[in-house]
């Protein structure tokens, strides 16, 4: 395999699970958490088998202190924005990394409160992403909406059926006080597995991985 091609593929492909130098996929708890992006995902896109996964089965209070939530998100992002090695294997490189969504659309009702506006400004700074807003009454079915990788549905109205035909993930969760849940409304997790052996001989990976 060409190291140049592998590195280019790693940097440019948009998928939830990436595999290099191996003939099959994998889905192993913690080592290779599994879950797709785009149409192969729904909700906040938390991967099955990841350290975040048990959190999705709990109920959380809606946000009451935006400042506290912003501080918690900043602290969590400072840790989870780095490549995190999922095991100590020498024969495989298994790691996970969180990537901010490039563009997020917020669908809400009229006149969101000032605290929410302040929160969105903080989110843009923390994750360096583009966040657009639109009122539910002005939302239209056209291809321009497909430029977003995630739509955050905060309107009291139900999402229309046509919205599911597009490539983005649809997140209908309310803003909650828990940062480990809330972060997945702004980022998505990628799991990467690279075989580092050839017929049992260690060190035959086509890609050099730096864990920061």
Label the predicted regions:
Residues 1-212:
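Conserved C-terminal structural/oligomerization subdomain of aldehyde/semialdehyde dehydrogenase
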